[in-house]
Amino acid sequence: MSNIVLSISTNIQKEVMAYYAANYIERKAAGVIFAAKLPDTSITMYKSGKLMFQGGGAEREAARWGTIIYYWSKG
């Protein structure tokens, strides 16, 4: 399972929310402003501007939005 974190602008945040709107899920964790779940990837956006992708499709989905600043794999 891969974990990837991007640092994104406010404009990209809006694009991400629109793109994954159909996959929206509610997350009540502190600092979370948006979350979505795909069959193979969880996506979490934070107030800090960080966007985290977790799961088998993390690399694929992160590549749509920007340069990876953190990457780690549990394998």
Task: Label each PLM-derived region with a short phrase.
Residues 43-60:
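Intrinsically disordered, low-complexity regulatory segments enriched in Ser/Thr/Pro
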Residues 22-23, 27, 37, 49, ...:
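Generic signature of intrinsically disordered, low-complexity segments enriched in small/polar residues
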Residues 1-41, 64, 68:
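Short Lys/Arg-enriched alpha/beta "domain-start" segment
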